[in-house]
Amino acid sequence: PKFTEIGRSTMEAKIIPSLWFDNNAKEAMNYYVSVFPNSKIKNIEYYPDEKLDEHFVGMSGKVLNGEFSLNGLDFICLDGGPIFKFNEAVSFTVTCKNQAEIGDYWSKLSHVKEAEQCGWCKDKFGISWQIIPENLGQLMAKGDKAVQVLMKQKKIIIEEFENL
């Protein structure tokens, strides 16, 4: 999107998801770039000496700003302590070409069995993912029977929709 302000030139706004980890941002970045193709860690800055500011107490050496990309999508993250927790109100959707791809991402990203439902899963860092076929809209167009199939699934099984 482009935004114009009085006295300023037109600029493009870039939206970048920001992830607040307790104290394992570097581990998470390394993990995610191993899961998704065309991914990399771009930059990591660490908290300075904790004596510089009262907010840095106990944070020296942890990630202050991590920048990484997953299959071309930029993310930023930090170690911010246990103040905030991830929940299902925000999730990332991975669209897959086929059942094999769904299975691959599911095996890498689903670590909380009780969170598995309708293609949703939660990884070991608490982030929610939706692992879905890229043609889910077509599969769901089959009506109430498709909804019933989806509601019974944890990992989506494409064949169960095709057999309706």
Where are these regions (language model features)?
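Short loop/turn microsegments at loop-to-beta-strand junctions
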Residues: 16, 63, 116-118
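Short, Lys/Arg-enriched N-terminal segments with co-localized hydrophobic residues
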Residues: 1-10
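Terminal, contiguous helix-loop blocks that mediate binding/assembly
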Residues: 152-164
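Core segments of cupin and vicinal oxygen chelate
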Residues: 19-72
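Vicinal oxygen chelate
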Residues: 21, 25, 35, 70-74, ...
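A short, polar/charged loop-to-alpha-helix boundary motif
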Residues: 136-151
